Amino acid sequence: MQSNLVIFPNAEAAKNSTQTEERTITKYERAEEQFLELLAIEDLDNKLDANPVRGSEFEQTLSMAIGAAYGNDRSDEQAHRFLQRILYRINRLKLFWYDDLQNYTNERSLYLYSCRDQIETAWQQWELAQIDVAALQQLDVKHALIERASADLNPPLSESSRYIREEMTEAGYRHLLAIGSFDGLVEGSRLCYVLGGAANEVQCTLVRVLIEEYGNGRLSRKHSTFFAQMLAEFGMNTEPEGYFDLVPWQVLAAANHNFLTTDRKRYFLRYSGALTYFEVAGPAAYKNYLAAAQRLELSEAAMGYWELHIREDERHGRWMLDDVVLSLAERYPNDAWELLLGYDQEKLMGDRAADAVVRSIREAE
């Protein structure tokens, strides 16, 4: 006989679970504050050599977070967020922000490098496990790149794309701009890392992309200026990183991956493949944002960045495919599969970040 007894959830167990989660979040927040304090210490490496205990609590939390994010099947969202925020705070020292020069006092710290390497080693293994690298190595690279670019130029609308086009409110649009400002206000910065060295057609094409991103040297035409104008139209913060706390870890991960592949010249093919996807697929995403702005009857200034990007990135996508990655595939036939790896990883991370942004917008609305 079936029992009619109703089993209610164990309130005490649920309470304990919530308290554990809150303690973990608080632990990550405290560790990030400790890390910021370490960043500001003059001569950090020598100070920690003299007093190792000073960084021990942060280091314990860092180790715990790496295990929680990458060490089991059930990834911990808060651990991911903590790690990507720490990694970004280290990586951002590679750029100059026109702020207090003392902020760069530890830019070459071996301790910071050690923290970065600990995170990157575990994180990159976790990311690579999501790609069938062996399968990529068997493909006709040039054919696969052309096929991918053709498919990603005008992809079918996803559920998230339809939501942005048809349902997102003005409040949601402002939230989109807030998150988007994380990249939009410093656009193209990391591309600079791969432009030095021997002159050739590939290098010159990349320089052309950068020059257009930077408005041909005119601040009024720089892409980030158009993004700032969109923010200003709503009375929003136009300072870089002004909405850093809103940025999902998935977006931070894409930026940190970009720092990694531009910083290491051995990953030049991966970066080139990634940039090709970014330039090819960008216009489709921007058309969604533009459609939303037009539906909401926003001003030209509130959507001008999207219109500019659609025009220019369609051209940049063709340049990247024809003059960069196909050329590199011929120049490095044994390693050309890395172009596909970079392309596919950028797509995977980009899709993951886009989904996270839409979830954040829905929550904000």
Where is each model-derived feature located?
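Non-heme di-metal
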Residues: Q2-E365
